[in-house]
Amino acid sequence: AADDKGQLMTFVEACRAWRAVHGELPANLTIFLEGEEESGSPSLVPFLQGHADELRADLALICDTGLFADRVPAIVTQLRGMLQEEVTVRGASRDLHSGLYGGAAMNPIRVLAAVLAGLHDASGRVTVPGFYDGVLELPEELRAAWAALEFDHEAFLGAVGLRHPAGEAGRLPLEMLWSRPTAEPNGIAGGYAGEGFKTVLPAEASAKISFRLVGDQDPQAIRESFREMVRARVPADAEVSFVGHGASPASRMDTSSPAFEAARRALSDEWGTEAAFVGSGGSIPVAGYFKSVLGMDSLLAGWGKDDDGLHAPNEKYDVESFHKGTRSWARVLAALR
């Protein structure tokens, strides 16, 4: 499927086809398959540090992105970082009968719901203290370049049954996706949610929250600030615990390198339309670690489409994307040799 085995095999097929035609690859390539991206890549940095001499290269090619608007080849030049937190609020020593204790005893679901509701102010800005430290406003030349892409915000939201943009007031969805940080509850649990009804005050409630980071935001500093904020917003007799999951900073590529322009021309030739430099709302930690540990930029290109259903049942990858993606990588390899 598109995220990401299909894309990996597209690159591998390009290498196989090149060798079948030319006898050897056009450059000294190291193929590196990293399978922990969805969990924050906890083993990646130690591995890169331990094998830096073997892995260091002029440039990394990463095949984990998609087409822009399903038709325009795109090279991703910036990625958001990621911070994942799990918080649990505990109250009574056991579940309580809501008729006997309701109104007198603390309800952890109410406490946690208030914390989650308070993550944003009325304008949509995140309220975690210091959250926007290191967040830069979008340069005007980049804003103009993105505007020239003519992204259809209404169609983007309409495709998933929505009409009104969320996020910070006054910012378009494309800006929110590519250049602004977010805080999003991803799941909440507590009490009884099974068949029928049980009138309980739960002993505990928990939630999973992810933060997408941009610019120079510090994941660890935000983690600590978030935890301090939660502790300050719960009642004195509530016990709060946290589990930290993945954490990785945002990353930006140096597009002044000749490799980026060479790849852009190669993709334009294959797809018959001008390739675009774009941002990405997603997080691919390995790109940032290639830069910080190995000192090399990453050229990110991919052939996924909006209807591929990433992270959903029946996720797919178009045959056209496989065939044209294979030829695209072959063109990029030829342009970079």
Over which residues does each language-model region extend?
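A short beta-alpha structural unit
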Residues: 211-214, 241-256
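Acidic/histidine-rich catalytic neighborhood of metal-dependent amide-processing enzymes
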Residues: 4-78
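Short beta-strand/turn micro-motifs at beta-sheet edges
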Residues: 73-77, 194-199
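Zn-dependent metallopeptidase/amidohydrolase metal-coordination segment
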Residues: 88, 112, 186, 201-205, ...
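Acidic-enriched catalytic cores of C-N bond-cleaving enzymes acting on peptides and small amides
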Residues: 68, 77, 98-188, 217-239
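A generic structural motif
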Residues: 2, 93, 211-218, 248
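Flexible glycine/proline-rich, aromatic-decorated loop/lid segments
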Residues: 74-90, 299-304
